[in-house]
């Protein structure tokens, strides 16, 4: 299967990116693209390199080689805070909310780059559309929320900077199964407003259900890509990830 569009036209274009930690290669020449206004899933087993790719895109780690372009500009060597200002938000694995702060304060901390108060208020309302329970919990401390609600808060906080691209690392990890569809409904709401989503997920079935396009990573390499629904029916996915 071919990519949905050319590297030059993509909102995000990753080309031949390699990352190593202490001499051990985590990524071995990854190339992928994400079109504007889409959900793109990165699936694969533990150690496949999915998180390393997000860390490279967000400026947390520097690639050994390769190029990362975003909205037409080379961002490969930019610092993490500059990448946020360019319009990329990264919600890492593990929720990482500020437990002693209220839901409202957690959300507003995500909007630290936005000085326009009316813009912050609009983004709060957008967050409540995606995750209505957050409105009801607005003045509660984050520590009082369930694990699923904390994940909703972490994702919503990621949207508060008004990103063009929202990167989510394992949003369903450790979440009660009954709350996972609610989290993914919120992710789809975010994408429907025009924010592109790059989704790392071990829950392959759920990721491919909501994604437009998907890449399969194994040992730091892309081994398959394609339309998410078509990929879900492929023998590779069925045998390797769905147990079919």
Predicted feature residues:
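Helix-to-loop junction immediately C-terminal to a conserved catalytic motif
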Residues: 58
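Conserved ABC ATPase signature
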Residues: 141-145, 149
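ABC ATPase C-loop
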Residues: 158-159
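The feature captures the beta-strand-to-loop junction immediately N-terminal to the Walker
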Residues: 43-45
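Short, glycine/charged-rich "phosphate-handling" switch motifs in NTP-dependent
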Residues: 213, 225
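ABC-type ATPase nucleotide-binding domains, specifically the catalytic core motifs of the NBD
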Residues: 22, 78, 103-122, 130-132, ...
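Conserved ABC transporter NBD signature motif
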Residues: 66-73, 86, 119-124
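Conserved structural motif at the start of ABC-family nucleotide-binding domains
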Residues: 12-14, 27
């Amino acid at each position: 299967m071919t990519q949905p569009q050319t590297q030059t036209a993509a909102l995000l274009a990753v080309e031949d990116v390699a990352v190593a930690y202490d001499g051990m290669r985590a990524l071995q020449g990854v190339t992928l693209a994400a079109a504007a206004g889409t959900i793109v899933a990165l699936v694969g087993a533990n150690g496949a390199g999915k998180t390393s790719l997000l860390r490279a895109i967000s400026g947390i780690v520097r690639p050994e080689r390769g190029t990362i372009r975003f909205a037409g500009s080379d961002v490969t060597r930019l610092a993490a805070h500059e990448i946020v200002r360019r319009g990329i938000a990264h919600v890492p694995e593990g929720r990482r909310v500020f437990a002693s702060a209220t839901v409202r304060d957690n959300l507003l901390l995500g909007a630290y780059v936005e000085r326009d108060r009316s813009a912050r208020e609009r983004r709060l309302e957008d967050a409540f559309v995606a995750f209505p329970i957050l409105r009801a919990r607005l003045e509660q401390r984050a520590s009082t929320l369930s694990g699923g609600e904390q994940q909703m808060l972490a994702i919503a906080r990621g949207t508060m900077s008004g990103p063009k691209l929202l990167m989510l690392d394992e949003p369903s990890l450790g979440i009660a199964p009954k709350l996972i569809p609610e989290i993914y409904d919120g992710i789809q709401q975010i994408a429907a407003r025009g924010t592109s989503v790059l989704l790392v997920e071990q829950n392959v079935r759920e990721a491919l259900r909501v994604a437009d396009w998907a890449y399969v990573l194994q040992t730091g390499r892309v081994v398959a890509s394609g339309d998410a629904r078509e990929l879900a029916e492929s023998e590779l996915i069925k045998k390797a990830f769905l147990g079919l």
